[in-house]
Each structure stands twice: as structure tokens, then as C-alpha cells.
Amino acid sequence: MDPSTTILRVKRKRGTDPADALLLACKRIRPEATAAQPSDESEPEPQEPKIENSVFKLVATVVSQDAPVQPHVREALARPRLAHHALRPSQGSSQRIIGDLRSVKWSTRREERYRILSSHRAGLPSEPAPAGGGGEENHDSHAESRDGLPLGEVQVFDILHEEEDVKVPGKMVVSDPETILCNSVKMIREKLSVSGAGLGTEHREKEDDYVYDLYYQETATPGWIQDILSVRPYSQEGELVPDEVAWEEEVYEDEDDENAEANWRNDYPEESSEGDSEGEERYGGCWSEEHSYSRRSRECYRRDMIDELENDKDEDDEEREYNDSD
């Protein structure tokens, strides 16, 4: 095992399928330079840790959290593996991932299926133990030291595999005839149950219902992991490439002036042709017959009006001549 080894220990419910590999976006603490700097030179300011992408492969599954980690990892690494580099991302994919993850903040851990529980670094007594978790960390330290590996070279992250709520579609809700309603609002029934087994015994989950999957990174990166931004399952290299967002906005050239008269956007059809085309599209062949009939009706009406005006004019002339003769 390489120095500064990081192992992911995922708590998974028994009966669910484990992920073959996990894609981990994290920040690492770079090791300090061995060469001492002169006293007259000012120390450089510490740089912000860069976001890195690492692939951890499933190497073993244990039934207890107290089981030693390193023997199982060593045994899995000693076995011959056919696809040793099958899940390792290419350099181009890694660069695209790093560029995409630079914009990710700590709040992006919200909807992940894997939740970080704790972090342990075996065999570091100088670091203060967190409150409430000192016993577990000391136990891990003794377990790792018995394996013969130097202290302080293993970092273990405990991760919980959370199951998604599976809702059955179309499930009918049976109404309870004894339900008490007040203004169409269901009232809450309070029931008191006394049990000698303790509070909430029926809702507790047995520890035997869970197993622990161990994930190991083949190519160790120098430096301890400081912050984990996201953990997600990873099966093939194509998943590392982010999907391109297809924008529905129209792209115009810079020389395309919308206010120019010759612009294609300002070519509007005539009102009559537009009305005819809409009517033809809506009514089909009946529109042409109806349209021609209405045109003939207008022409007939126009001729009738002209004839009526001419008749009125003739009558006026005759009446004027009759008056002049008198």
C-alpha cells in the first residue's frame, strides 16, 4: 500500500447492490516542502487547496465496522485483476472534470446519495480526538498498528449509503372510517403505548442489517484529503464528461442588424395574402368557394347600387322637365 493511503468505508444496507466504484471530488492538503527556506526570506502565503477528482474502487466488504481495514485491502490488491486500469479516467476527462468542479461549492453536497459521517487518521495521537468519537478512533489506531504498517499512513472516511424513498405509483389510499374530521381536516389521534423494551424499540434498525464496503484508490495522490465535496457512483468514463446544455436561444451574427430594412425579420406578408392563407389552411377547399361567392356578392351589390343611382337620376330629370313645361 502506498503512503498517505485513503480508504472509504461505506455503510450499506444488506440486500442492496454496492457501487463498483465511487467518484470523489475533494480538496487535499499538500505535503510541506522538505527543503528549509532561509530565514531572511518571507514565507509564501498558503494557497487554497485545489479541487481534485479521484476514483475509488470496491475492494472488499466486511460485516462489522470494527473489522481491520488494511488486511482486506492488501488481500484484494494481491489478487490478480484483469481490468486493472479499466475504471481510471483519462487525462482529458480529468481536466474537464476539474474545470467543471471549480464552480462547485460546499452547498452542492445536498442531494447526494452518500453522506459523510466521520474521518479518521490512524495512529496520530498528537491530534485531539473529537468529542464523542474518541473510542472509535483509538480502536482504529490499535487495529491499524497491529497490521505492521507505520502509524499515520491511513486515512479512513466513514460514509453512509442512503436509500432513496421508493414510491409505488398508483397506490390507493384506503380511508379509515373511524377518522375524525373537523372542517374537512383530519384530527390527530394521540396514543400512549407502554413497553418495557424501551422507547422507540420497534423503529430501531439492527446493526446486523448493514455491511461495510471498502473502497481504495489505486494511484495514491500525495497529501491528506481535507474536504469532500461530493461522492457519487461511477461506472464508466463517459459519466465523467458533463452534459452540454443545449440553449434554445437563437444565435445571430454580429453584423446582423435587426433594424435594417433589408433584414429578413422585417419582411412581413401583405394582410390580404395572410388572411387568405390562414383561411385556406383552416377551411381547406371550402374557403375558396366561399371566398369566390362573397366576391361575386359584392360585385352584384355594387352593380345594383349603380343601377339604382342611375334610375334615381333619370327620375329626377323627368320630374324637372315636367315642372319646366308647366
Curated annotation (Swiss-Prot):
Report the sequence similarity comment from the record.
Belongs to the IWR1/SLC7A6OS family.
Keyword Nucleus assigned to the entry: answer is yes
- Biased region (Basic and acidic residues) positions are 136-147, 280-297
Instruction: Kindly report the protein's main subcellular placement as a broad class.
Output: cytoplasm
Cysteine disulfide links: none
What role is this protein assigned?
Directs RNA polymerase II nuclear import.
Q: What protein does this entry describe? A: Probable RNA polymerase II nuclear localization protein SLC7A6OS
Quote the biased-composition stretches of kind Acidic residues, using this chain's numbering.
Answer: 269-279
Chain segments carrying region Disordered: 30-52, 120-147, 252-297, 307-326
Keywords of this entry: Cytoplasm, Nucleus, Protein transport, Transport
Which gene name does the record give? slc7a6os
Give the PANTHER family listed for this entry: RNA POLYMERASE II NUCLEAR LOCALIZATION PROTEIN SLC7A6OS-RELATED
**Superkingdom of this protein's organism:** Eukaryota
| Biological process according to GO | central nervous system development; developmental process; midbrain-hindbrain boundary structural organization; protein transport; somite development
Q: Name one GO cellular component term.
A: nucleus
**Compartment list:** Cytoplasm; Nucleus
